[in-house]
Structures are given as C-alpha cells and as structure tokens.
C-alpha cells in the first residue's frame, strides 16, 4: 500500500525555458531523497552542485536553497540568488587611476583618423556634437587644420578610503629632484673641503696648528681658520634648518634630529600656581581656569599677576550681545517677532533703527523743553573739575628743564563758602567749641547767625548761670506727689473725657442728621427721575429728545442708596405689594 501512494513533488531538473507542472513522486522516491539528504549531511555522499559547479551546503534549509519561481523557472537548487548581484555592485577606481596632469600642448595631428569628427577631425566627439563652425569641406576630406583632441578628465569613483587618502595621486618620482639637489650640495661641500685641506698642506698652516701647544692639549685656537670653516659649515646647515624650524621644536643641524619641546614658554602653568585640590578648577580639555587660584590665600586680583580667565567672559562683544538679547526679549513681549538665534540680521537692523529713533526722540524732547522753559545757558558751562580747580598742577622746573617740585594735585576746595564774616563777627561759625556745641570765637556765642557782642558777650556766656541751671533737676522731676494732688489730676482727666464725649456725641448726631437729609433729597430726585422715565416711555420714539445735554458724573452714596431702595425686583415675592 505504501508503494502505491503518490506525492506531489518538484523535479530536480527540467527545461530551463518553460514552466512545467509538478510531477508526481512516489513515497519510495521521497524516502530515497530523504536518505540522500541525510547521507550528504553526514558526508557520505557528494554535495549537490548548482549551475555554476559550486557545492551547495547540505545543512542549508530548503527555503533558502530553493529558487523562487519568478527568478528561475527551472526550479533547480542554487545559491546564486543569495549572493551579491553583479548589476548592483559598485566598482571603484584602481590605485593607478588618477586625473591627468601635465598634458603636453602643441602636438598637432596632420592626418585624419578613423572615427574622428568629420568636421574638425577631433577624436573626442562626433560631427553632430561639434562646436566648431561647420566647414564647407570637412577635415575628413581635406586633412587640413585638424583640431586637437579635447582635454577630458576621467570620472573617478573613489570609495571611503580613497577619498580620504592623503597620498592619492602622489608620484614618488617627484621626490628624486629634491634628493638630487641635496646630493649635489653634499658633493660640492666635500670638494670644497678637500681643496681647503690641500691648500693648508701646501702652505704649511696645518703643520703649525698640529705642533701648537693648544692643539696638543686638545684646545683650538681662537679665531683660527678651522673655526671659521666650521662657522661657514654651520651657516650652510642653517640654510636648510630654517626650512624645518617650527615653533615648539629644536633642530640640531649636526645630527639632523628634531627635538620636541612640550613647553617653550618661561611663565608658570595655571595648574601649578596653587597646588591645593580645593582651589580654582582647571579644565585640561580647554586649558582654562576661570576662578582665581590665589583666592584662598586672601590676595585680591590686583595684587597677583594672574587672577583667572573670568575677565575674558566680559570682553569683546559679550556686553553688546547681552544688550541685544535683552532688546530681543523686550521687543518680543511688545509684539515684535524677532529672535537672536533664528534671525540675527533682522534683530540687528531693528536694534540699530530703534537706537537711532530713541536718540532722535531724546534730542527733540530736550530741544522742546529748552524752547519752552529756557535754560540753555546753564548747560553751556565748563566741567565741574575746572570750576573747582581740580586740574591745577603746581610744577617747578630747573634751568635744564627737569622737574624740581610738582606733580602734586591741587587740594580740593570745599563746596561750602569759606572765610565769609557776617553780623560784625571777626571769626567764622565753628571757630569755638564748648560742651559739645559750636559757636563764634569772637563772642563765645552758640547761636548761629547772631549779632556779635564782643568781649561783653564773652563775659555773659562764661558766667556760672547757664541754661542747664535754669532747667529743673532730675530730683524735682521725680519728686513724689501727695494724695490730694493725685486726686485733683484724676478729676481733671475725667472732666476732659466728659467734654470729649459730649463733643463727639454732638458731632455724630449732626452727621446722622446730615446723612438723613441727603438721603431724603436723593429719594425725591430718584422719584422724579422715575416719573420722567415713565413719561418718556409713553411718548413715541420720534418725539423723544436727545441725550446730548445729559450730565455724566459718578453717583454719590445717597443716590446709590435711593436707587437700590426704589429699584424694582421682579424675583421678589413681595414685589406685587409694593405698589399697594
């Protein structure tokens, strides 16, 4: 029974051109197929091969190895659809491809070439794309005045690394020119040095130098010829050292090495000014120290050479930027659509125009006030420093023009009038002092603006009878009172209170009477107004008068009270009984 059961399966092979219906597969064939797959997974059977001859991993699931019907109608297992497609791959330029440089000019073609432009003879375009004036007889037939090929640069497709390669397009052969120049310089130096040695040997100077005692002890003579030669060699070396000289580096021309100096300045680093960990914070990323490193030591910023970087925050355009931001906020609150970051140009133009208008308005306002009230002469005065002699400098010069004495500021005068004597006084007020009081020294008077009494005033003011003696003493002030005196004072206080009450009662009665009279008048006026309103409502609208003569003022308290008393209240249940 098992062998007779059929299963629908897809054939392993088929015609690549057409779509075939799935053929029936018996259960025996299905079992053989599964056994073959197991053998392939175990490695006992060779792996399946695709159309390119590549092995298919037997462990790959069927839904991956099977080709969709819209890709390959043959239904043959393959992994081609899982690999990158050639038509979708990006091809980049090779390392040897680069832009053309140093194109030779002046090469002229004298013969027409096959495939060139029939009009001008250039190989880079055709006749329909030629920009030259159409010739009566083209270059194809005449072979005269053949135009050169156009200069076209290749379109390079560079990948991520190719775009960032700093040596891309570099030709190492260009460096040979520099190497040749240095080799020629070295050869010339050696030749020159050999000639000098031969000249010294011929003249005998070299033998004298060797036999000198300074040379025997290993010392060179000062200003010798060899020293000059060495100096000249150093100058030649410095010629090339200048090209390599950079800030922060030392170039040794003898050994041709470069020594990097991490710090070439002689000042103290910020982080070394105060080694306390709780002192000003040093940010190593920005190399900034905003706080004062000497703040813990109790030194003011004026006493130290470095007080932090906070002063930089208020230099440049910082203050003007803050003023512009404040103007933007104020303008936005008043309805102007401006913003410092969104539209800075608009804000700057608006701020400048506002500043000009404000200055013009203040000038016009000042001008109008001066025209109306006057006082321009009080504004045209010299500075206060000149009025009070603040700028007077006394300087003495010698015959030779040097300063002997001077450069001292003039003493500032007091704002009060000085040395002015009044009322026959010979001394000013404040020239005499006694018992905590100021007075005149000429008459010992303690009364300001008084008339001078001379020596007689001195005798009177210096007598033992003083105002203090006439004043009652503390003992008299604190003297105990008798019972009769205390009783009399109480009676006086009671009488005063009774009088105050009577006067207060009479005043309150008068006020109440006045209020009642005012309220009565207001009620009568309200009744008259209501009657007038009823009469006006009975008339036709066209016969009513105008309200142009109506007096508008704030109603008094009595009028408001009368209005409330006479007002109709329809919600009041007792309103119907008011008219009865």
Swiss-Prot record:
Biased composition (Basic residues): 493-502
InterPro entries noted in UniProt: Slu7_dom, Splicing_factor_SLU7
Zinc finger (CCHC-type): 115-132
Subcellular location, principal: nucleus
Stretches with biased composition (Acidic residues): 232-245
GO cellular component: cytoplasm; nuclear speck; spliceosomal complex
Single GO MF descriptor: zinc ion binding
Location of region: Disordered: 1-59, 200-252, 488-580
Compartments in which it is found: Nucleus; Nucleus speckle; Cytoplasm
Basic and acidic residues bias: start-end ranges: 20-41, 523-544, 551-572
Transmembrane segments annotated in the record for this chain: none
Metal-binding listed as a keyword: yes
Disulfide bond entries: none
Record keywords, A-Z: Cytoplasm, Metal-binding, mRNA processing, mRNA splicing, Nucleus, Spliceosome, Zinc, Zinc-finger
GO biological process assignments: mRNA splicing, via spliceosome; RNA splicing
Assembly information from the UniProt record: Component of pre-catalytic, catalytic and post-catalytic spliceosomes. Associates with the spliceosome prior to recognition of the 3'-splice site for step II, probably during catalysis of step I.
PANTHER family hit by this protein: PRE-MRNA-SPLICING FACTOR SLU7, STEP II SPLICING FACTOR SLU7
Sequence similarity: Belongs to the SLU7 family.
Role summary: Required for pre-mRNA splicing as component of the spliceosome. Participates in the second catalytic step of pre-mRNA splicing, when the free hydroxyl group of exon I attacks the 3'-splice site to generate spliced mRNA and the excised lariat intron. Required for holding exon 1 properly in the spliceosome and for correct AG identification when more than one possible AG exists in 3'-splicing site region. May be involved in the activation of proximal AG. Probably also involved in alternative splicing regulation.
Name the record gives this protein: Pre-mRNA-splicing factor SLU7
Lineage, top ranks: Eukaryota, Metazoa, Chordata, Craniata, Vertebrata
Protein encoded by which gene: slu7
């Amino acid at each position: 029974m098992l062998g007779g059961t059929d299963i629908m399966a897809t054939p392993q092979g088929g015609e690549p051109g057409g779509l075939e219906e799935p053929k029936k597969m018996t259960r025996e064939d299905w079992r053989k197929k599964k056994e073959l797959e197991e053998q392939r997974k175990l490695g006992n059977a060779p792996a399946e091969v695709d159309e390119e001859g590549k092995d298919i991993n037997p462990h790959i699931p069927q839904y991956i190895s099977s080709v969709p019907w819209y890709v390959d109608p043959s239904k043959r297992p393959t992994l081609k659809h899982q690999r990158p497609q050639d038509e979708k791959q990006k091809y980049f330029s090779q390392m040897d491809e680069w832009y053309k440089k140093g194109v030779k000019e002046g090469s002229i073609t004298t013969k027409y070439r096959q495939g060139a432009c029939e009009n001008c003879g250039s190989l880079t375009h055709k006749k329909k794309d030629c920009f030259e004036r159409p010739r009566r007889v083209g270059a194809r037939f005449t072979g005269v005045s053949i135009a050169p090929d156009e200069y076209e640069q290749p379109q390079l497709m560079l990948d991520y690394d190719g775009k960032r390669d700093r040596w891309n397009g570099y030709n190492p052969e260009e460096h040979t020119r520099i190497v040749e120049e240095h080799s020629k310089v070295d050869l010339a130096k050696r030749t020159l040095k050999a000639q000098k040695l031969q000249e010294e040997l011929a003249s005998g100077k070299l033998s004298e130098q060797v036999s000198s005692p300074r040379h025997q002890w290993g010392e060179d003579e000062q200003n010798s010829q060899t020293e000059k030669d060495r100096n000249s060699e150093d100058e030649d070396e410095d010629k090339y050292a200048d090209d390599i000289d950079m800030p922060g580096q030392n170039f040794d021309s003898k050994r041709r090495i470069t020594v990097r100096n991490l710090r070439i300045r002689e000042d103290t680093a910020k982080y070394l000014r105060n080694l306390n960990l709780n002192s000003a914070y040093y940010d190593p990323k920005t190399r900034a120290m905003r706080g004062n490193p000497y703040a813990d030591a109790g030194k003011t910023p004026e006493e130290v050479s470095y007080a932090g970087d906070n002063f930089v925050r208020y230099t440049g355009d910082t203050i003007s930027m803050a003023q512009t931001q404040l103007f933007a906020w104020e303008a936005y609150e008043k309805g102007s659509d401006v913003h410092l970051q969104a539209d800075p140009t608009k804000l700057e133009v608006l701020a400048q125009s506002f500043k000009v208008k404000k200055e013009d308005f203040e000038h016009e306002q000042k001008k109008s006030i001066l025209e109306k009230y006057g006082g321009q002469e009080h504004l045209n005065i010299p500075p206060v420093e000149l009025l009070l002699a603040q700028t007077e400098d006394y300087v003495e010069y010698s015959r030779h023009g040097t300063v002997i004495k001077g450069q001292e500021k003039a003493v500032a005068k007091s704002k009060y009038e000085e040395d002015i004597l009044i009322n026959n006084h010979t001394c000013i007020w404040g020239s005499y002092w006694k018992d905590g009081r100021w007075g005149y020294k000429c008459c010992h008077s303690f009364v300001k603006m008084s008339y001078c009494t001379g020596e007689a005033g001195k005798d009177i003011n210096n007598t033992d009878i003083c105002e203090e003696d006439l004043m009652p003493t503390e003992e008299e002030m604190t003297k105990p009172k008798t019972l009769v005196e205390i009783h009399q004072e109480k009676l006086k206080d009671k009488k005063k209170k009774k009088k105050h009450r009577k006067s207060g009662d009479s005043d309150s009665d008068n006020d109440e009477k006045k209020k009642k009279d005012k309220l009565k008048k207001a009620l009568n006026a309200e009744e008259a107004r209501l009657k007038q309103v009823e009469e006006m409502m009975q008339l036709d609208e066209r016969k009513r008068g105008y309200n142009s003569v109506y007096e508008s003022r704030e109603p008094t308290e009595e009028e408001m009270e009368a209005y409330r008393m006479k007002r109709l209240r329809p919600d009041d249940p007792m309103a119907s009984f008011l008219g009865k």
